[in-house]
């Protein structure tokens, strides 16, 4: 089992303890007011994440895409359709059951670069995830989608995404690493048939067990 001690800047930790941020509304307001997010806030763009107190499964991806930013709905694209297929749940259950938390590595769309969406901003997850997770006592499984989530939550793991996903059992029962469900990764899925033959069925069993647990 790989454990991760979240590293938070000392000064910021002091400020947070001083102003006593406790609930999600306060945390969300603090994210919006953070100078790091000033450009987004001034444009009327607000952090995109979901953290119902009843959540049992936490999904950590890269960052919202442009479509998610525009629609104000995370995983609202073909990647989301495939993710729900992998999880074995439908659209309504994914968004409305209260079972799933969605905490990407950045809560804002970082923009587009030469090879696709830019990476999440450094330090964002370190700053906000621990506080939010402190409000989610029922998380039983964290699904880590892509290299940024895996590097942060599995700091002792030095493998690339393919090998990390292939060796997923060593991270269970707390973490399940996945490749990104983007259609652009279909070639990867085709070249690695073990993923849909072995990983996805086991993921669906885990999700079903967690959903049905009293």
Curated annotation (Swiss-Prot):
InterPro entries: HI_0220.2 (IPR047124), Uracil-DNA_glycosylase-like (IPR005122), Uracil-DNA_glycosylase-like_sf (IPR036895). Belongs to the uracil-DNA glycosylase (UDG) superfamily. The lineage of its organism: Bacteria, Pseudomonadati, Pseudomonadota, Gammaproteobacteria, Pasteurellales. Gene3D superfamilies: Uracil-DNA glycosylase-like domain. This is Uncharacterized protein HI_0220.2. It comes from Haemophilus influenzae (strain ATCC 51907 / DSM 11121 / KW20 / Rd).
């Amino acid at each position: 089992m790989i454990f991760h001690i979240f590293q938070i800047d000392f000064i910021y930790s002091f400020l947070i303890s001083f102003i006593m941020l406790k609930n999600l509304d306060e945390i969300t307001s603090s994210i919006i007011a953070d100078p790091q997010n000033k450009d987004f806030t001034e444009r009327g763009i607000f952090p995109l994440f979901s953290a119902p107190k009843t959540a049992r499964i936490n999904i950590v991806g890269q960052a919202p895409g442009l479509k998610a930013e525009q629609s104000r709905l995370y995983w609202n694209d073909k990647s989301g359709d495939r993710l729900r297929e992998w999880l074995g749940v439908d659209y309504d259950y994914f968004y409305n059951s209260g079972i799933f938390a969605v905490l990407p590595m950045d809560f804002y769309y970082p923009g587009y670069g030469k090879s696709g969406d830019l990476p999440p901003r450094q330090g964002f997850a370190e700053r906000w995830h621990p506080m939010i997770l402190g409000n989610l006592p029922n998380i039983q499984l964290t699904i880590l989608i892509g290299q940024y989530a895996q590097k942060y939550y599995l700091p002792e793991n030095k493998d690339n995404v393919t090998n990390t996903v292939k060796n997923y059992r060593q991270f269970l029962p707390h973490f399940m690493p996945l490749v990104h469900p983007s259609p652009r990764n279909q070639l990867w899925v085709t070249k690695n048939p073990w993923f849909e033959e072995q990983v996805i069925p086991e993921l669906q069993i885990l999700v079903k067990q967690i959903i049905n647990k009293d």
